[in-house]
UniProtKB/Swiss-Prot annotation:
Residues 259-331 are annotated as: Disordered. This is Uncharacterized protein L248. The lineage of its organism: Viruses, Varidnaviria, Bamfordvirae, Nucleocytoviricota, Megaviricetes. Its main location: membrane. Keywords: Membrane, Transmembrane, Transmembrane helix. Residues 262-291, 319-330 have a biased composition (Polar residues). Residues 292-303 have a biased composition (Basic residues). One of its GO terms (cellular component) is membrane. Residues 306-318 have a biased composition (Low complexity). The chain crosses the membrane at residues 7-27, 31-51, 65-85, 92-112, 191-211.
Length: 406
């Protein structure tokens, strides 16, 4: 409290008084301004406390006077700072200045649009712009060369540091009273509560929004909780089959018997031909480990089953022949079921067919072949005359080929 007597000679108080004198006497501003009233009240209270310091020995009276001085000092500094900031912004964003720029830009764009049709008339504004640009650049370069900025930066920095130091000293002297300490403690408590709110609510929300996580931020930071990936990913393709059609690659690892058990009816003469053909394929053959031999072998079995089905369906079916057809169908169904099991076992494998190949024409061709019964006709022709099927000039094969493309 002894330093209150020295505040009248403080440089910051003298500077504030000089600023008020220049503002209210030279610029003739209204004396009834709140800022001027605060400064006058502060000076009167400070002088009264300095003169009557020895007589005001009571603690309550001195404590109240220091609190009043503290409040007035804070309000004066806040008003001056706000005034400086507002004056700077008004100078930069002055309405008339902005209006002049807008009008000049509109007029210039109008002139350029009118002169757009004639390229020769555009030379004048372009030359003017180049001239102004060059002159402004020369003035700026000259200004920078002739003025040494380092001393200006040094003295400006020293001046503002000195102001901050004096403000801090005055504030520390005037804050040594009971009411100011209570207010400062409450303000610090509010600030701490705001910080806790920011750390507990806003920061976790920002972290979860940034990383796309909905879990507790503490568990995420401590690596306790697992990352919750988005659940909208469509993984249903893993449950589907890789291929819907039958491929010969699936026949490589397929274990099938060497012969098809096809019961034959003695009353059906066409079945006798199929028996002979079946006997031709049932001759013992040395097993080969190559894929091509296994493909040919299984392909012959499929064609034989198709040929037997077509021959049985073309004649009048007796009870015995009906049983034969059912057995053939059972063999074909068994073979297809085995193929399906192989494909299901390969569900996770990648397709071997190139993805960029257009299979629409091949699919339509195969559909026409199935609808027209071309596969059964080829199998029937092969069963009757196997040597004629390999002939390209066979008229029956040409006719079947034309029917496939319809």
């Amino acid at each position: 409290m002894d330093n209150i007597q020295n505040l009248c000679t403080n440089p910051l108080i003298i500077l504030i008084g000089t600023y008020m004198s220049i503002k209210y006497y030279l610029f003739q501003i209204d004396y009834f301004n709140i800022q001027f009233g605060l400064y006058v009240t502060f000076i009167i209270s400070l002088l009264y406390g300095s003169v009557r310091f020895n007589s005001l020995q009571q603690k309550k009276l001195m404590d109240g006077l220091i609190f009043i001085l503290h409040v007035l000092f804070v309000l004066i500094c806040f008003s001056i700072k706000s005034e400086i900031i507002s004056g700077t912004l008004n100078t930069i964003f002055y309405f008339g200045f902005v209006k002049t720029i807008i009008i000049s830009v509109v007029i210039g764009s109008f002139i350029l649009s009118e002169l757009d049709n004639n390229n020769h008339n555009r030379i004048i504004p372009e030359k003017m712009c180049c001239f102004c640009k060059q002159n402004i650049k020369k003035i700026m370069v000259t200004f920078v060369k002739n003025i040494d900025i380092d001393p200006i930066i040094y003295w400006s920095k020293t001046f503002f540091v000195k102001l901050y130091t004096e403000f801090k000293n005055i504030n520390s002297v005037l804050s040594k009273n009971t009411r100011s300490e209570i207010i400062i403690d409450r303000i610090c408590l509010k600030i701490s509560l705001i910080k806790m709110y920011l750390y507990s609510v806003i920061v976790p929300y920002a972290i979860s929004s940034f990383f796309g996580m909905n879990n507790d931020y503490k568990n995420i930071i401590n690596n306790i909780d697992k990352i919750d990936y988005p659940g909208n990913l469509d993984m249903s393709f893993l449950e589907q089959e890789v291929f819907d059609s039958e491929h010969l690659d699936d026949l490589d690892d397929l274990d099938t018997p060497d012969t098809l058990n096809v019961p034959i009816s003695t009353n059906n003469t066409d079945n006798l031909n199929s028996v002979k053909t079946n006997q031709q394929f049932n001759t013992p053959v040395a097993k080969s480990n190559t894929k091509s031999n296994r493909r040919k072998k299984t392909g012959k079995k499929i064609r034989l089953a198709n040929q037997t089905t077509s021959s049985n369906s073309s004649n009048n079916q007796s009870p015995e022949s009906t049983g034969t057809n059912n057995n053939v169908v059972d063999n074909k169904t068994l073979l297809r079921n085995k193929l399906r099991e192989k494909r299901l076992a390969r569900t996770g494998s990648l397709p071997t067919v190139p993805q960029n190949v257009d299979m629409s024409m091949i699919n339509s061709l195969m559909q026409n072949m199935i609808n027209n019964g071309s596969l059964e006709k080829i199998a029937t022709e092969f069963a009757k005359n196997p040597e004629n099927v390999a002939d390209i000039n066979n008229p029956k094969l040409r006719k079947l080929a034309k029917s496939m493309t319809k």
